[in-house]
């Protein structure tokens, strides 16, 4: 019979299934909870062992210092360097083993690859932005200049050459012919195009018939006769230019500047209604004032356009220069990675060369 323990000597195999009292470790009292958790026995044992190791190590160091031979020599003393700041000997850099050195080289190559990709991306972005700015400036300069009249049209006979009409061939008006081909369009396209309300109200950009043009010419002649100007070609050209500027003024009546000009002109006209003999002079003075304001506004627009162009030119130069710098930096980093790869390849090949020097063991 198997001997057991306790009150049931024959049931020793069932002792582990008996219910026993659970012994709990004491917790930290509430008055000392601000100090943290209470140290348990296993924590105390671990701390005591560490303290004994430190005490033993300090005792060994003190004993070695007390028994040190002043004439003792060690080969490491020839390479030891003392740090003047703290009076301690500087630690020599630990030489890496071959596996660690290879891993560091591979890490450097991976970092260089990412840096090269980022630098090339930024350089390409700057180059594309500079190209876009140059294309915008070129397109604006192309469409704002007058045509060079280099369009050559070939005909089949002498009769077609004599009766050739460029307005009918290109389907444009004389005013459209003076514009650049990229922006002038065609009459049949403009007839089907819905213009914005402000352009329709201003009276500009509309195709006029021959009767309307004759009426305009008669109005110009009547105004010249009332103003008493000489009927010379130069005087007529200057007068027509002022009238055109006055008509163009109507296209910008939605701006504050020209609204002010309009109010001033209306005030001047209402104050001078009692002098019917001076209508021509007053109208001419008002037109001259409006033309002057319009020319000043045009000069201001040209100045703003010149400032924007200069800003674009400066930005293009800066972006091109930065793109070159980033490309040069990426090239140098790529060259460094190639050198590291070449060095790793040489190390790999030198292991199998019969005449290669080997490090003494």
From Swiss-Prot:
State the name under which the record lists this protein.
Probable U3 small nucleolar RNA-associated protein 11
Q: Major place of localization?
A: nucleus
Annotated signal sequence is: none
Its job = Involved in nucleolar processing of pre-18S ribosomal RNA.
Q: Where is the composition biased (Basic and acidic residues)?
A: 37-46, 217-228, 342-352
Species whose genome carries this gene: Leishmania major
Q: Subunit notes for this chain?
A: Component of the ribosomal small subunit (SSU) processome.
Q: Which Cys pairs does UniProt list as disulfide-bonded?
A: none
Task: From the UniProt record, give one GO term of the biological process aspect.
Answer: rRNA processing
Keyword set includes rRNA-binding: no
Q: Where in the cell is it found?
A: Nucleus, Nucleolus
PANTHER family in alphabetical order: U3 SMALL NUCLEOLAR RNA-ASSOCIATED PROTEIN 11, U3 SMALL NUCLEOLAR RNA-ASSOCIATED PROTEIN 11-RELATED
Biased amino acid composition, Acidic residues: 278-287
Q: What residue spans carry the region label Disordered?
A: 1-52, 200-235, 262-295, 311-361
Cellular component annotations (GO), alphabetically ordered: nucleolus; small-subunit processome
Alphabetical keyword list: Nucleus, rRNA processing
Family, per entry: Belongs to the UTP11 family.
In this chain, composition skew of type Basic residues spans 17-33
